[in-house]
């Protein structure tokens, strides 16, 4: 079932009440009485050892880039390591002032550091360093660029029960690992589940976790986020790992008071839009007696993994991260922070020395420092290789940034309807880039930016490096295409064969198939938007550029849709439109293929052809496959051209079918004889005329004053003179 029409992943719905479970009962007031055990605070001894030869980290080894967040425990910064062995690597640095931490908070901080140092799991955030100064504690963690799961699912995506199952399954593996170490998580909520750049989850924020010696030991403190608390936590009757499995299945209420009442009185219900398997799992998780709760038995998480709801999950593949996530966050360079609250990212990063705490506080944190052994070679010596140093990407954070402060603008590379492209040089690094300057009054670039952020890491899609906005224009800084346009390169070659054309089309079709599989259509795949990043002429160096007309498949409410949602819940007319747009992309590739093989364009003889003449030829669907180069071109090539240029867009091959065509799969059988071609400028002129004619066939309606309409003028003529 589709779920994303909800404002929150688990809002309170009209529910069918569950029968309260016999067993534990408690008055609501029980949650208000402090526990005797809660007042006992003990320092947690730290027994972790550091590999011989490792060096302790300190604040001077990290360059502050941005503020990512701020909470009751301190600030989180995006930082770059500036010393070996991992110089250039980006981390999230959690900084806590000792002087402002309560004693209880200090214990929690040490607890978080101990837990993270122990944990090594694909779905739990990794601790790389921990150290302290006189006034502060530092945790250096993975920098997870995808933001938190709650923000992503509630604000951006139409998702289904199948999609939610993926996240819950990864979460179950992460929790199971923590439980195997004797750790109760106790603060499980969507805000503490982050996404990496691929869309896999990572559990984070272990400040409320509690290590238990064995499964019999209970914790008593009143902690966690109330919406997700198990009844035994609210009632302070002692809780074990099973409290996490309650939180795992909880439905979030409208407000804290209402949620607390529901938890205490067991007035939980079951949303009827869920499948029977999902309802069965929730009923098994929502047992007020923790001993009866699924996951609390001797098999632990294995009970949950065996549940029928997860019958479609391959747990081994999931652990190896081989199952594709339903949603890929839009992230560009490794140091971007598009997915963090602008309230924090717009602040100037500043880490003050911190007021020294009381005399005994430093002793409380003894043994706090930690170095990840993964940063050392097997023999204990530091690694000699360095991570690549990335250029700083300045992002839009509600301010107008001056592009010329960071870059020197050079000559114009190209001019479009809504933008101009220029070469530019980054002042700090002297690196060359291209900048696309878009007139905001003529075009909204937000979709183009989002697509480039989400998919620009593909090897054959242009990479977005930086974004500026001065109010009137948006500046998109991308890698510089030094090799020029595809057709220029091909037609200037002294020798170009059919086999080489197959390699070129293979690379481009692979990229288009990737975009289409993600619900993205380019809609402007003319040859001038396919360029080489260098002058090698290698097909793998091709880049698809200019996503100004590109679209992502969205629902009527504007949200993106996961593949599962698209397959099950999208209206036929929406899919038909998407198929039409995909067909247009294939048609453009067909034009390119025809031109590479024939040496001239299929529907235009030259730049002097009128749009009407060109459109008539396109509409007829007729083009020649005989004479000239066609006498030596293979029959499989002619077959592919015919199927890509079919007059009906819904009967054209898909990008996937193009990749499966014998002309692509059996390149070694293709001729290697030289293909002749018309004059370069004639071919380019004819190609430009073709796309100009296509654009002219879609006139934009012009809105005029209502008084200028024929109906309004006729009414004025009929009015008596006294009313004028």
From Swiss-Prot:
**Main localization of the protein?**
nucleus
What does the record give as the reaction this protein catalyses? L-seryl-[protein] + ATP = O-phospho-L-seryl-[protein] + ADP + H(+); L-threonyl-[protein] + ATP = O-phospho-L-threonyl-[protein] + ADP + H(+)
Q: What class of enzyme is it?
A: transferase
Localization: Nucleus; Cytoplasm
> In this UniProt entry, which cysteines form S-S bonds?
none
Binding-site positions, ATP: 68-76, 94, 413-421, 436
InterPro entries (alphabetical): AGC-kinase_C, Kinase-like_dom_sf, Pkinase_C, Prot_kinase_dom, Protein_kinase_ATP_BS, Ribosomal_S6_kinase_II, RSK_N, Ser/Thr_kinase_AS
Q: In which tissues is it expressed?
A: Intestine, thymus, and lung.
Coiled-coil features, chain-numbered ranges: none
Domain AGC-kinase C-terminal residue range list: 311-380
Gene Ontology MF: a single term: protein serine/threonine kinase activity
**Alphabetized UniProt keyword annotations:** ATP-binding, Cytoplasm, Kinase, Nucleotide-binding, Nucleus, Phosphoprotein, Repeat, Serine/threonine-protein kinase, Transferase
Any one GO cellular component localisation term in the record: nucleus
Protein activity control: Upon extracellular signal or mitogen stimulation, phosphorylated at Thr-562 in the C-terminal kinase domain (CTKD) by MAPK1/ERK2 and MAPK3/ERK1. The activated CTKD then autophosphorylates Ser-369, allowing binding of PDPK1, which in turn phosphorylates Ser-221 in the N-terminal kinase domain (NTDK) leading to the full activation of the protein and subsequent phosphorylation of the substrates by the NTKD.
Does this entry carry the keyword Nucleotide-binding? yes
Query: What is any one GO biological process for this UniProt entry?
Result: hepatocyte proliferation
Tell me where in this chain the PTM Phosphothreonine is found.
348, 562
List its EC numbers. 2.7.11.1
Q: How does it assemble?
A: Forms a complex with either MAPK1/ERK2 or MAPK3/ERK1 in quiescent cells. Transiently dissociates following mitogenic stimulation. Interacts with ETV1/ER81 and FGFR1.
Function statement: Serine/threonine-protein kinase that acts downstream of ERK (MAPK1/ERK2 and MAPK3/ERK1) signaling and mediates mitogenic and stress-induced activation of the transcription factors CREB1, ETV1/ER81 and NR4A1/NUR77, regulates translation through RPS6 and EIF4B phosphorylation, and mediates cellular proliferation, survival, and differentiation by modulating mTOR signaling and repressing pro-apoptotic function of BAD and DAPK1. In fibroblast, is required for EGF-stimulated phosphorylation of CREB1, which results in the subsequent transcriptional activation of several immediate-early genes.
Tell me what this protein is called. Ribosomal protein S6 kinase alpha-1
What is the scientific name of the source organism? Mus musculus
Lineage of the species this protein comes from: Eukaryota, Metazoa, Chordata, Craniata, Vertebrata
């Amino acid at each position: 079932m589709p779920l994303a029409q909800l404002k929150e992943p688990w809002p309170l719905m009209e529910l069918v009440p569950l029968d309260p479970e016999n067993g534990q009962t408690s008055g609501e007031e029980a949650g208000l009485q402090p526990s005797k055990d809660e007042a006992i605070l003990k320092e947690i001894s730290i027994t972790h050892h550091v590999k011989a030869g490792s060096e302790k980290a300190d604040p001077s080894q990290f360059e502050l880039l941005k503020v990512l967040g701020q909470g009751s425990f301190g600030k989180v910064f995006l930082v770059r390591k500036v010393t070996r062995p991992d110089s250039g690597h980006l981390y999230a640095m959690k900084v806590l002032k000792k002087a402002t931490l309560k004693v209880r908070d200090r214990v929690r901080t040490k607890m978080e550091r101990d837990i993270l140092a122990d944990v090594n799991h694909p779905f739990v955030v990794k601790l790389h360093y921990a150290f302290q100064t006189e006034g502060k504690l530092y945790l250096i963690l993975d920098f997870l660029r995808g933001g938190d799961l709650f923000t992503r699912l509630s604000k951006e995506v139409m998702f289904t029960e199948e999609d939610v199952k993926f996240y819950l399954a990864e979460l179950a593996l992460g929790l199971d690992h923590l439980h195997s170490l004797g750790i109760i998580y106790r603060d499980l909520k969507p805000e503490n589940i982050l996404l990496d750049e691929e869309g896999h989850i990572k559990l984070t924020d272990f400040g409320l976790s509690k290590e238990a010696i064995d499964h019999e030991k209970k914790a008593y403190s009143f902690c966690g986020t109330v919406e997700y608390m198990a009844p035994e936590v609210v009632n302070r009757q002692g809780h074990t790992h099973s409290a996490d499995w309650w939180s795992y299945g909880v439905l979030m209420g409208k407000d804290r008071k209402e949620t607390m009442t529901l938890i205490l009185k067991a007035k939980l219900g079951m949303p009827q839009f869920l499948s029977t398997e999902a309802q069965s799992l929730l009923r098994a998780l929502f047992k007020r007696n923790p001993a009866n709760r699924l996951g609390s038995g001797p098999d632990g998480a294995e009970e949950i993994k065996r549940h029928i709801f997860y019958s479609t999950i391959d747990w081994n593949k999931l652990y190896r991260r081989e199952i594709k996530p339903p949603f890929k966050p839009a992230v560009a360079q490794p140091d971007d922070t598009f997915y963090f609250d602008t309230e924090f990212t717009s602040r100037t990063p500043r880490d003050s020395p911190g007021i020294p705490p009381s005399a005994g506080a430093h002793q409380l944190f003894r043994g706090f420092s930690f170095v990840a052994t993964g940063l050392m070679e097997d023999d204990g010596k530091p690694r000699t290789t360095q991570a690549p140093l990335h250029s700083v990407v300045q992002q839009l954070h509600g301010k107008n940034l001056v592009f010329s402060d960071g870059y020197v603008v050079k000559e114009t590379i190209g001019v479009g309807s809504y933008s101009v492209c220029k070469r530019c040089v980054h002042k700090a690094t002297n690196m060359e880039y291209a900048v696309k300057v878009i007139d905001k009054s003529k075009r909204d670039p937000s979709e183009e930016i989002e697509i480039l952020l989400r998919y620009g890491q593909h090897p054959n899609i242009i990479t977005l490096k930086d974004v500026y906005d001065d109010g009137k224009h948006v500046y998109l800084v991308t890698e510089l295409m030094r090799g020029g346009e595809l057709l220029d390169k091909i037609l200037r070659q002294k020798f170009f064969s059919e086999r080489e054309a197959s390699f070129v089309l293979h690379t481009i079709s692979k990229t288009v198939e990737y975009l289409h599989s993600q619900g993205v259509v380019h809609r402007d795949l003319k040859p001038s938007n396919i360029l080489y990043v260098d002058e090698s002429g290698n097909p793998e160096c091709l880049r698809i550029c200019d996503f100004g007309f590109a679209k992502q498949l969205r629902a009527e409410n504007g949200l993106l849709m996961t593949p599962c949602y698209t397959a099950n819940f999208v209206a036929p007319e929406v899919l038909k439109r998407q198929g039409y747009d995909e067909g247009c992309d294939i048609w453009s590739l067909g034009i390119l293929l025809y031109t590479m093989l024939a040496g001239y364009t299929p529907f235009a003889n030259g730049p002097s052809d009128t749009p009407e003449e060109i459109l008539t030829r396109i509409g007829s669907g007729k083009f020649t496959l005989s004479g000239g180069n066609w006498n030596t071109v293979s029959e499989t090539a002619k077959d592919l051209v015919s199927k890509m240029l079919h007059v009906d867009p819904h009967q054209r091959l898909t990008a996937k079918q193009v990749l499966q065509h014998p002309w692509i799969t059996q390149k070694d059988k293709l001729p290697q004889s030289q293909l002749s071609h018309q004059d370069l400028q004639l071919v380019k002129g004819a190609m430009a005329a073709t796309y100009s004619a296509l654009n002219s066939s879609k006139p934009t309606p012009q809105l005029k004053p209502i008084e200028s309409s024929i109906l309004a003028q006729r009414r004025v003529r009929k009015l008596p003179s006294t009313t004028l």
